[in-house]
Amino acid sequence: AKRELLNVFLTIPKDRILIVDPMGEYAPLVRRLGGQVIEIAPGSPSHINPMDIQLDLDDDESPLSMKADFLLSLCELVVGGKDGLQPIEKTVIDRCVRLIYRDMALGLETAKTPLLQDLYEELLKQPEPEARRVATALELYCTGSLNLFNHPTNVDLTARVVCIVLKGLGENLRKIAMHITNDFVTSAVNVNFHNGISTWCYFDERSEEHTS
């Protein structure tokens, strides 16, 4: 796969390359190619904000609805349990997501990309006890010891080659990291497609070219 990656890099200069690297095996090559290596781990200086959103895409599906769906799935992972989120919990999460993105959706100049903590704080404002249950589960990832996803994005996600390293994560945190990584990859592929750019995605030694 590394040989194919290098071949794509050298022969198809317009294409983008995205790598999800569980063991950090691709990181040295990506650095040599001048790409962006992002190490997702507690204490890492690199951060991807799961609340990032691309609102200006001319797509069939609303970016806000897609982000709400992603955050519902994220909260489901965080809350856990065999039954997942209950209908009322899904309703209050969806409501809060739309509230915290309201300024961005309206195109206000003062609008800022929210953080996970903004969702947490909005949940605490809701009257339903179910909202507090979800907020309590999120607390660990906002103000607790696993707050690595509660930061603004500080890496170049638009680099031609991006390698996300998931080495050193526990099982639960790895599931959340993979969910956030998959959301980034899906979003990047969509943006690239709209710009007429093909994307090569590498997961666990398997590659797939996205051209649509």
Residue ranges, per PLM feature:
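Glycine-rich phosphate-binding loop of nucleotide-binding enzymes
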Residues: 1-42
